[in-house]
């Protein structure tokens, strides 16, 4: 299982909340990730691709899936550009089944690294074709736009009407394809198709392609808000994971399953601590589902790791406000007060961070949907303060909305192609995602109250943690200091062993 962007700091945030928050929602205050780490073997994983220090999700996933060093942004290739066999292909070659589950697009970098071969991660239309050609047994996530023909972009077209009939109108659709291939129709004879959670629940055997959104699935905060809604159409992470286990386990030879918590990464990119905590909680729920399934078996290997860390996140101590001096009962403090020189971040912050009800992404989408005359600092204050325990002022909202020349501007670049961007006053080179920089600025505005610091809007080189849980003779190889290629090689060795062994890998995305 892969928490995309899940470094040790993100695991620390989750664990702090579980253990120290007064209103922790974690069962017995013990996360599933903690169970895996305590009951299995723990390793530390370097993740740099060939020739660089920092990994993107495509190279990171490719290294985990193949056991070979990749180049940045490559999918399913080694650093020389040669197509290399991935663990899904290994599983199929030896008669096992394979599945991929994500809360992002099925064609996004992390799942792509396990089942496709393309020169660049941006080739999502081609990645979808690769997945069809590989006949991955279970594919669950979002991203319909890469599977349906270009004609779908006209909502008045017969193509759009036919698609709505096929999907039951589960959600509005667009297309990013530049041809008229409808991959859904191409696979319909080989796969059962599901576009909502009810249809997914009905499937009890066989291959399944479940696509539940035009792009990514709802984020963890949206999921929490809609969980009890009888009209909810999207399956949860837990529901997708449980269904994948149910279907793949029907192969007596065994299976490989990769489950990604992809929006951990996105919360890190956006410097959104509240969303990050909820994404970690949601991913941990999926880990718990697999842990409970695995714990009474002797034939299954569960790996929980990150592909890289995102945002250089952390709690930090601060120079203000300095807490008042207090008296302690211990004899050492009989004549002196307990008076730390700095504010070391009280645990009450954890419940306040958890109280956030919308991600920064949702907040800014609401702001952008206002009529232009209403897109004012005052309205941004209303939106943010209505969804967060950390309130902002009009002046702070104005800071979030202030623009400046884009010093990273590159004409035609997929991300850095706008002449102006929200104004970042330092480390501009590490904030590259255009209008999303407003979210980074919002994270900075509340940082002092949260005691949260962010080092970037991109990835860091921080090593990640891996927890291996399962048969003792298998998990030992995942302890110690490793590189992600070591993890990939040992996963392939484990699934290729003569003893029926299942590898379940979990990771983060860039």
PLM region spans:
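Short hydrophobic beta-strand that contains or immediately precedes a catalytic carboxylate
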Residues: 1-3
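A post-motif C-terminal structural segment
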Residues: 6-12, 16-62, 108-508
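Short glycine-rich, polar/acidic loop-and-turn segments at beta strand-coil junctions
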Residues: 15, 68-70, 104
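A glycine- and small-residue-enriched flexible loop/hinge segment at structural boundaries
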Residues: 52, 56-79
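Short secondary-structure capping/junction motifs at helix and strand boundaries
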Residues: 71-74, 96-101, 139
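Glycine-rich anion/phosphate-binding loops
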Residues: 77-85, 122
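Glycine-rich phosphate/pyrophosphate-binding loops
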Residues: 88-89, 93-112, 499
């Amino acid at each position: 299982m892969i928490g995309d962007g899940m470094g040790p700091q993100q695991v620390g945030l989750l664990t702090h909340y579980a253990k120290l928050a007064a209103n922790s929602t974690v069962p017995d205050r013990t996360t599933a990730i903690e169970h895996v780490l305590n009951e299995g073997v723990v390793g530390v994983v370097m993740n740099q691709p060939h020739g660089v220090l920092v990994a993107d999700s495509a190279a990171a996933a490719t290294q985990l899936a193949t056991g070979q060093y990749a180049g940045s942004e490559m999918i399913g290739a080694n650093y020389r550009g040669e197509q290399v066999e991935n663990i899904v292909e290994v599983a199929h070659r030896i008669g096992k089944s394979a599945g991929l589950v994500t809360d992002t697009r099925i064609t996004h970098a992390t799942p792509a690294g396990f089942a496709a071969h393309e020169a660049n991660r941006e080739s999502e239309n081609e990645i979808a074709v690769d997945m069809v050609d590989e006949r991955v047994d279970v594919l669950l996530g979002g991203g319909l736009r890469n599977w349906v023909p270009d004609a779908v972009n006209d909502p008045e077209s017969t193509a759009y009407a036919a698609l709505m009939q096929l999907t039951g109108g589960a959600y509005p659709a667009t297309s990013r394809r530049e041809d008229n291939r409808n991959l859904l129709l191409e696979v319909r004879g080989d796969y059962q198709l599901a576009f909502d959670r009810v249809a997914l629940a009905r499937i009890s055997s066989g291959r399944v392609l479940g696509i539940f959104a035009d792009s990514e699935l709802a984020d963890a905060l949206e999921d929490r808000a809609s969980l009890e809604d009888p009209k909810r159409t999207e399956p949860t992470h837990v529901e997708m994971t449980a269904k994948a286990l149910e279907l793949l386990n029907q192969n007596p030879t065994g299976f490989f399953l990769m489950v990604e918590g992809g929006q951990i990464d996105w919360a890190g990119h956006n410097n959104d601590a509240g969303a990050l905590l909820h994404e970690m909680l949601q991913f941990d729920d999926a880990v718990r589902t697999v842990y409970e399934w695995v714990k009474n078996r002797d034939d299954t290997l569960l790996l929980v790791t990150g592909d890289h860390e995102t945002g250089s996140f952390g709690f930090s101590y601060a120079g203000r406000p300095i807490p008042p001096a207090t008296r302690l009962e211990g004899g050492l403090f009989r004549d002196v007060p307990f008076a730390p020189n700095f504010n070391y971040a009280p645990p009450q912050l954890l419940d306040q961070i958890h109280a956030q009800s919308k991600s920064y992404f949702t907040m800014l989408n609401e702001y952008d949907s206002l009529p232009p005359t209403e897109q004012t600092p005052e309205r941004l204050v209303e939106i943010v303060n209505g969804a967060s325990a950390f309130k902002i002022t009009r002046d702070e909202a104005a800071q979030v909305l202030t623009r400046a020349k884009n010093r990273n501007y590159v004409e035609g670049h997929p991300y850095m192609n706008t002449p102006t961007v929200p104004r970042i006053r330092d480390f501009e080179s590490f904030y590259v995602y255009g209008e999303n920089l407003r979210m980074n600025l919002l994270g900075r505005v509340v940082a002092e109250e949260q005691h949260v610091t962010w080092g970037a809007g991109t990835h860091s080189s921080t090593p990640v943690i891996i927890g291996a849980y399962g048969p003792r003779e298998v998990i030992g190889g995942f302890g110690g200091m490793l590189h992600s290629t070591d993890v990939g090689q040992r996963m392939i060795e484990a699934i290729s062993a003569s003893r029926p062994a299942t590898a379940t890998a979990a990771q983060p995305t860039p």
